[in-house]
Curated annotation (Swiss-Prot):
Belongs to the Smg family. This is Protein Smg homolog. Pfam families: DUF494. InterPro entries: Smg.
């Protein structure tokens, strides 16, 4: 399923090509690209649920304390290793993510059928969430820079 999400993001969203609106046409396109029907349906459901998160009726998106500390569940820790959780904390500290977008990311990560996520895949999920979160254009651009601008070899600081 994650491969399909990446395919859609790279070929439609990130390339600024208009995403096909008709789900049947999109399914046919993905089938022609070599993806299986069951995985296509999972990916489309994942995207629909991402869009639903923007409605803000999830309890974790309301009435939060900006200074609270996130405690991960056992299942979340199995899917997000220490490196991934540390990266989420880093993104909050540098204001790329806030409490709401962090929770959206965790929600979407937990919906993936991967047993565990590597940091590179987490970065793409974060990018997808920020792209779909109105009012977070600056955070999206910062995240995009973190993904695409690799530091020069042997150079840690500017």
């Amino acid at each position: 399923m994650f491969d399909i999400l990446m395919y859609l993001f790279e070929n439609y969203v990130h390339s600024e090509v208009e995403l096909l609106v008709d789900e049947d046409e999109l399914t046919k396109e993905l089938t022609r690209a070599g993806f299986h029907q069951s995985e296509i349906l999972k990916a489309l459901t994942w995207l629909e649920r991402l869009a639903e998160l923007q409605e803000g009726d999830k309890p974790y998106l309301c009435n939060h304390d900006q200074h609270s500390f996130r405690i991960y569940t056992k299942e979340e820790m199995e899917k997000l290793d220490v490196e991934c959780r540390g990266f989420l904390l880093f993104l909050e500290q540098v204001k790329v993510l806030n409490v709401e977008t962090r929770e959206m990311v965790i929600d979407r990560v937990m919906e993936l059928d991967e047993p565990a996520l590597i940091l590179e895949d987490l970065k793409w999920v974060i990018l997808m969430v920020l792209f779909n979160a109105p009012g977070h254009e600056s955070a999206y651009e910062q995240m995009e820079d973190l993904i695409f601008e690799q530091p020069e070899e042997g150079r840690l600081h500017s």
